[in-house]
């Protein structure tokens, strides 16, 4: 018979072994994920005012 509790414990043990192998603690995961997200979204939030100055306004034709 399949025991769900034994399966969950096995998954938890595997995750702990993986985390020990890569020397990652649970409290370091928050710092790691936030730094990765910050690095990924940095180019999107950087304002490039010099490029905005080079743009020409669009001409609108009114009927």
Curated annotation (Swiss-Prot):
<dbReference type="Pfam" id="PF12133">
    <property type="entry name" value="bCoV_NS6"/>
</dbReference>
<comment type="function">
    <text>Could be a determinant of virus virulence. Seems to stimulate cellular DNA synthesis in vitro.</text>
</comment>
<dbReference type="GO" id="GO:0044167">
    <property type="term" value="C:host cell endoplasmic reticulum membrane"/>
</dbReference>
<keyword id="KW-1040">Host Golgi apparatus</keyword>
<keyword id="KW-1038">Host endoplasmic reticulum</keyword>
<comment type="similarity">
    <text>Belongs to the coronaviruses accessory protein 6 family.</text>
</comment>
<dbReference type="GO" id="GO:0044178">
    <property type="term" value="C:host cell Golgi membrane"/>
</dbReference>
<dbReference type="InterPro" id="IPR022736">
    <property type="entry name" value="NS6_bCoV"/>
</dbReference>
<keyword id="KW-0472">Membrane</keyword>
<protein>
    <recommendedName>
        <fullName>ORF6 protein</fullName>
    </recommendedName>
</protein>
<dbReference type="GO" id="GO:0016020">
    <property type="term" value="C:membrane"/>
</dbReference>
<keyword id="KW-0843">Virulence</keyword>
<keyword id="KW-1043">Host membrane</keyword>
């Amino acid at each position: 018979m399949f025991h769900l509790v034994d399966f969950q414990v096995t998954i938890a043990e595997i995750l702990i072994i993986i985390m020990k192998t890569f020397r990652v603690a649970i409290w370091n995961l928050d710092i790691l994920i936030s730094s990765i997200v910050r690095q990924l979204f940095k180019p999107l939030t950087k304002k490039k005012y010099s490029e905005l100055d080079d743009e020409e306004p669009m001409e609108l034709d009114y009927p």
